[in-house]
Amino acid sequence: MKPIAVLLFIAGLLIAADREGNFKIRFEPTAKVQTQVEVPFDVHVEDALGKPLPMNADVQLAIALPGRTPEASVKAWGVGPGEFIAKPQFPSDGQWAVTVTARRRDEVTQRTINFIVAE
């Protein structure tokens, strides 16, 4: 039984879990936040040392009604070091939670801001 326990322990060490990246995430819409059109969001991400994340970092923007699971998620594409653009489309008006998730290797950080979406 001990060899099995040792193997399971080693396997657990090999499977890397995500850890907090402590990234600084700033984002804002660059157009009117409204329904049925793609709304561009500028996203800026720096690591804990203040260095911009590379353009190939995995940055996602998700939209959800507050307290609910995301309705849609879009990939933000890199336009420069630490600079990304995402264009979600809001299906209805009202208050929406916009969450940006930035990932680099096994580091991940999320930030959520609520926006009022016009019709």
Residue ranges and their predicted role:
Residues M1-A5:
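Positively charged n-region of N-terminal signal peptides that target proteins for export
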Residues A17-E119:
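Contiguous segments within soluble domain cores/interaction surfaces
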Residues L7-A17:
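Hydrophobic h-region of N-terminal signal peptides that target proteins for export
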